[in-house]
Design a protein with these regions (language model features):
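Pyridoxal 5′-phosphate
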Residues: 1-388
């Protein structure tokens, strides 16, 4: 079965391209184009009244889509920003005792990695990093470090961006979280709409950040945060949008909304939310769930992994697969991460052949998604065999 018709505009721009970077810059479905146009039309139709519409209709719809996807009991625990870095800054600003004691890993995405390093340099944070390797013991080691205490904020990825390895200790970390600390922040960028994610049991204790750029098929500008009630109630870095609505706090001081709106910034571009809502409506109309899309991607990646193991992809078969496909139906990334000294060169040769992947250091990543078919994977295998 093919779903290419849902992506007709994007695919028509380069019909011969093989795009296996769905985990990086996912192609946008036609529904996102319709959302983009709707945003323009409504902005110009309603002009100054646009914001009434955005906050009455567009934002609540997006909140409901995310709450449904993640099993959140209250849509108003969701707030939006152009990117997840904005939320990291605001959450950490709310911990006013410095230096902030951070527990994290050596595998976090650059937005947090770089910021944490700079906080260390400035004396604003003391950072403890737990190694991902050996990953077989990661959950046990990271949980033990968290249970050891002495940390104000714990930051960890649901699925690690470079290796595609997924953690299994979110419940254990959530059990430690308290409004007075530690706060637990889960980076869900490679989990949201990539693998079925149910946060209903931990929604009252963890922060969860993600966005629309990857598996939500929405593009840039649609970062979001789930913020549990009672945690970080007065972030120091705060925008003027955070003072709209039902406010709380000392009458003589700066007041905040009680819901996730306490993390609003200032004037933002609402168009990405139009795209996101359009994509989610499309999925509902097509009867496609994250479980369905994940299963489709798993079938494609399993065939590619089989070809690698059988030597059908030339020298690519010499790479170490960091996130091999298991038979336990455990949450997993929507890409295969292959570690090899030639990863950069392989990616360049594939790009010259109009095959798009991406590379992180010595790891080349092949991402699978809704707009690919079994025939596309066979073409990919044939190209790899010819090139390598």
């Amino acid at each position: 079965m093919t779903h290419k018709h849902l992506f007709s505009r994007a695919l028509a721009l380069d019909p011969e391209r093989l795009h296996f970077a769905a985990h990086s810059h996912h192609l946008w479905p036609d529904a996102s184009f319709d959302g983009q146009v709707r945003a323009w039309v409504e902005a110009n139709h309603f002009a100054d009244r646009k914001w009434d519409l955005v906050f009455a209709d567009v934002v609540p719809e997006a909140q409901k889509h995310i709450s449904k996807e993640l099993g959140l009991p209250d849509p108003e625990t969701v707030v939006f920003a152009p990117n997840t870095h904005d939320f990291l800054i605001r959450i950490f600003s709310g911990w006013e005792t410095k230096p902030v004691r951070i527990l994290t890993t050596d595998g976090e995405f650059h937005a947090f990695r770089r910021q944490a390093e700079r906080w260390e340099e400035s004396g604003e944070a003391v950072v403890t990093r737990v190694s991902l390797e050996p990953f077989e013991t990661f959950d046990e080691r990271f949980t033990a470090a968290a249970q050891g205490g002495g940390h104000d904020v714990i930051v960890v990825s649901q699925v690690f961006f470079k290796t595609g390895q997924a953690i299994g200790c979110i419940d254990d970390l959530a059990a430690l979280a308290k409004p007075e600390g530690p706060w637990v922040i889960v980076d869900g960028y490679h989990g949201f709409m990539a693998t079925p994610t149910d946060l209903s049991a931990v929604a009252d204790r963890i922060f969860y950040v993600s966005g629309g750029y990857k598996y939500a098929m929405t593009g840039e500008g649609a970062g979001f945060l789930h913020a549990p009630h009672g945690f970080c109630e007065r972030p120091v870095v705060t925008g003027w949008f955070a003072e709209f609505g039902n406010l709380m706090g000392p009458p003589e001081g700066v007041q905040y909304r009680a819901d996730a709106g306490r993390f609003w910034g200032a004037t933002f571009e609402s168009t990405p939310l139009y795209r996101f809502n359009g994509v989610r409506r499309m999925l509902d109309e097509q009867g496609l769930t994250t479980a369905d899309i994940s299963a489709h991607a798993d079938r494609l990646s399993a065939r590619f992994a089989q070809a690698l193991a059988a030597g059908e992809c030339g020298d690519l078969g010499e790479a170490v697969v960091l996130n091999p496909i298991g038979g336990d139906n455990a949450p997993r990334a929507r890409f295969l991460a292959l570690k090899h000294p030639n990863a950069q060169a392989w990616r360049a040769r594939l790009l010259d052949a109009n095959v798009v992947t991406d590379v992180r250091d010595d790891v080349i990543r092949f991402g699978f998604g809704l707009y690919q078919t079994e025939e596309d994977v066979e073409r990919l295998i044939a190209v790899c065999k010819r090139l390598f």
